[in-house]
Amino acid sequence: MIINNANLQGLRVTFSAAFNKALETTTTQKEKIATTIPSSSKLNTYGWLGDFPQMKEWIGEREIQNLSEKAYNITNKHFEMTVAVDRDDIEDDNLGMYTLQMQQMGQSAKEHQDILAIGMLPGGFKGLAYDDKPFFATDHAIGDRTYSNKGTAKLSAESYGAARASMASIRNERGTALNIKPCLLVVPPSLEAEARKILTAELIEGTTNPWKGSAELLVDANIVNDEHPDNWFLLDTSRVIKP
């Protein structure tokens, strides 16, 4: 192939098509645990609502309730992946391997979204949330109340049940239940067998399993790190803002 602008543009079109096809067809898990919010600026400020009002009977004048808003700033990051195409391969029309490489790049780019999104779960033990505490902490505040969304027990039917009960017990400033409904259990591959037993077995240790079918299972290696090799997470992903 003669190297000129027209031929190079043709290569760009071919490589872009291969990349985009793989990008579109590769499936991800991030939609199960995170809400996608479009961004059109370098820095985005999100107003997190500490306590959203609930419906009540309308008697007399409206009672206007102020939203407890806290600012949470996120600066967008840029990511890149670059490969070189050898000039000799262009001149010799030896480009088939590069087309496959572009497809692999598209697949890797899509999978990187899972690495970032699902990787935020183990990152939540140190990364600060909107209240300047780690996302998973034992002393989050709602008004003059505090609640914990962090545990240390290894995954078992007992600890799973305790986590469900703890989540369901969380109330707002006025003492009304937040109606949290755990529906997704996220585990690393090392805990898949135990998780499947909890969610699918008819019996556990000879007694009826009350947790059969109580949640969907997501197995993902991105929640493992050296500090927390046996991480497991129970999430309510039924809300507009996940988790």
Regions found by a protein language model. Give the residues of each.
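Sequence/fold signature of self-assembling virion shell proteins
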Residues: 2-3, 9, 138-173, 179-243
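Contiguous, well-ordered alpha-helical segments that form the cores/surfaces of helical PPI scaffolds
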Residues: 80-82, 103-107
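An acidic- and aromatic-residue-enriched active-site/binding cleft used to recognize and process polar
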Residues: 51, 71, 86-90, 110, ...
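Alpha-helical scaffold segments that mediate packing/assembly in large oligomeric complexes
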Residues: 88, 93-96, 100, 107-169
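N-terminal catalytic cores of peptidoglycan-degrading enzymes
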Residues: 1-43, 230-231, 240-241
